[in-house]
Every structure is written in C-alpha cells, then in structure tokens.
C-alpha cells in the first residue's frame, strides 16, 4: 500500500495484507508485554513526580514518544493517529503532500482515549505475567505498553479507510442510512459475521503457532507468552467493536464533505470486491 498512490489504498489485496501484518505486530507486541507484571503504578495518575506534567508515567512517556516522532513526520502519515495531538511539533524534514483519500474531518475520528482506557484496565491484566508491581522494570514495561497501544491504534483507526470504501461502493443505500442517522442500520451494513469468524480463527492459530517470540527486545524470559484464547478475546471484545465504532463515526459525518468529481472512478471493481469481502 502506497499512500502516495490513492488507487492502492483501497485495493483489496493491499487492505488484506495490511490487516494481516497488523495482527502479527499486535500479537508479538503482546508477547513482549507479557514478560512483565501488570505494574499498575505505571498507569496511576501522578504516582511519580514528573515536572510540569499532570498524568501517569505511561501518559508522560507516550506523549514524549509522540512529540519526538512528530518531528520526523510520523503523524503526517494518513494511517497514524496520535494519543496526544496537543504535543506534536513541526517537522524539520521536507513536507510530504499526501493525496487526499479520506474525508476532510478524518483526523477528528479518534478513539485513542477509549483504547488507552481499555488497554490499561482490560488488556494488561489479561496479558501480564502477574498482577503485582515490577519496580525494576517500570521503564521497559511502559515502552512495551507504547508499542502495544500504537499498533492497536493503527489497526482500529484503519476502519476509516474501510468506511470510505464502503461509502463509495454502497452509494444511495448508505447515504439514506446516514441521512436517517440510522446507527443500527449502518452497523448492520458494515458487519460480516462470517469474515469476523475467520479473523478470530486465524488469530487463534497464530497465537498457538507464535507462542513465545524468540527475539524479545527487553529481556530473555523464555516462559513469556500470551494464551491464544486471550488474543481472540481481545479482538472479539475490543478491537473489532472499536473498529466498527470508527467506521460508524466516520460514516455518520460523511455527507459533510461534497462528493468528489472522481467518485465514480474511485468506486471501481476493487472497491466492490473489498466490500463483498466484509473486511474490517
């Protein structure tokens, strides 16, 4: 997928490849995080005295991480959504003028606050090595958290591209649902239970196959792994529902933008095949 070439962004094969790679990244990031205990102090607001900052240790580290990455254009990319947009800085590198693919308000579709809350309260307890503190590894723990959060965010916000493809392909049907503000109807239109089952089945097999990552970055804890059933539950209960929320939120506002002159061209065969696949 090349964001400088809009015709590749909604291509069925490219979409599928991107989603599969994201699954791999998320699973291996979970394996990295599973080396460490839950360490709830990392997520407790003002647990540590950080100068000129009000928030948790993870909030601070993640915001600093995003601030630095913004200087090298990470958040100029259409598929990256920051957790702390207020800390982003201008890049010193030449600006990249990405062609428009999404609606003008796409950057406003941001569920990262929900992702962060669910991650710290629901996901970490399921993948951590234990429920207690691990004071000697707080920094490594938080760094692993950041990789998990950013990979989850990219996967979930990819729903904006899915939604745009469905809007173009469905035409009057989806326009009518948007005009009626029919959230249930839109949800039904974007849901494909058969494809969802295939995703979960694939994740179960990947979880069994991957087991332990032999290239753990922070330590070499050979017992570190995440139960395949936990990975499936995370996708079923959180990743897929949040992706659908992103799609619905995007579609409900889609009529704010006037249709592009090239809408007919963009609704070619590859979008029809994408929709029939039910990928999200």
From Swiss-Prot:
L-tryptophan binds at residues 137, 139-140. It catalyses: chorismate = prephenate. GO terms for cellular component: cytoplasm. SUPFAM superfamilies: Chorismate mutase II (SSF48600). Signal peptide: none annotated. Pathway: Metabolic intermediate biosynthesis; prephenate biosynthesis; prephenate from chorismate: step 1/1. L-tyrosine binds at residues 73-74, 137, 139-140. Keywords: Allosteric enzyme, Amino-acid biosynthesis, Aromatic amino acid biosynthesis, Cytoplasm, Isomerase, Phenylalanine biosynthesis, Tyrosine biosynthesis. Residues 3-256 form the Chorismate mutase domain. Optimum temperature is 48 degrees Celsius. It is found in: Cytoplasm. Each dimer has two allosteric binding sites that can bind the regulatory effectors tryptophan or tyrosine. Can bind either one tryptophan or one tyrosine, two tryptophan or two tyrosine or one tryptophan and one tyrosine, which differentially affect the catalytic activity. Activated by tryptophan and subject to feedback inhibition by tyrosine. In the presence of both tryptophan and tyrosine, the enzyme is in the activated state. Induction: Induced by growth on methanol carbon source. Slightly induced by growth on the non-fermentable carbon source glycerol. Not induced by histidine starvation. One of its GO terms (molecular function) is chorismate mutase activity. The keyword Amino-acid biosynthesis applies. GO terms for biological process: chorismate metabolic process; L-phenylalanine biosynthetic process; tyrosine biosynthetic process. Its EC number is 5.4.99.5. Homodimer. Catalyzes the Claisen rearrangement of chorismate to prephenate. Acts at the first branch point in the aromatic amino acid pathway where it steers biosynthesis towards phenylalanine and tyrosine, and away from tryptophan. This is Chorismate mutase. The lineage of its organism: Eukaryota, Fungi, Dikarya, Ascomycota, Saccharomycotina.
């Amino acid at each position: 997928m090349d964001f400088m070439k809009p015709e590749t962004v909604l291509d069925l094969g490219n979409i599928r490849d991107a989603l599969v790679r994201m699954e791999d990244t998320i699973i291996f990031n979970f394996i990295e995080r599973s080396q460490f205990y839950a360490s709830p102090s990392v997520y407790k607001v003002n647990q540590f005295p950080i100068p000129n900052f009000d928030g948790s240790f993870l909030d601070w580290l993640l915001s600093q991480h995003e601030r630095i990455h913004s200087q090298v254009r990470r958040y100029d990319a259409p598929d990256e959504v920051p957790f702390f947009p207020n800390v982003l800085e201008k890049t010193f590198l030449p600006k990249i003028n990405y062609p428009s693919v999404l609606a003008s308000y796409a950057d406003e579709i941001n569920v990262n606050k929900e992702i962060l809350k669910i991650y710290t309260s629901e996901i970490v307890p399921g993948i951590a090595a234990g429920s207690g503190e691990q004071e000697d590894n707080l920094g490594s723990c938080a760094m692993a958290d950041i990789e998990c959060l950013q990979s989850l965010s990219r996967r979930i916000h990819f729903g904006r591209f899915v939604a745009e493809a469905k809007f173009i392909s469905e035409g009057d049907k989806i326009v009518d649902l948007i005009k009626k503000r029919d959230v249930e109807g839109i949800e039904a239109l974007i849901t494909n239970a058969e494809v969802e089952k295939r995703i979960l089945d694939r994740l179960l097999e990947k979880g069994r196959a991957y087991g332990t990552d032999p290239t753990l970055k922070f330590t070499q804890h050979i017992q570190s792994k995440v139960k395949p059933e936990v990975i499936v539950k995370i996708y079923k209960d959180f990743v897929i529902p949040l992706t659908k929320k992103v799609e619905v939120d995007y579609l409900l506002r889609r009529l704010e933008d006037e249709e592009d002159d090239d809408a007919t061209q963009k609704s070619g065969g590859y979008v029809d095949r994408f929709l029939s696949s039910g990928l999200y």
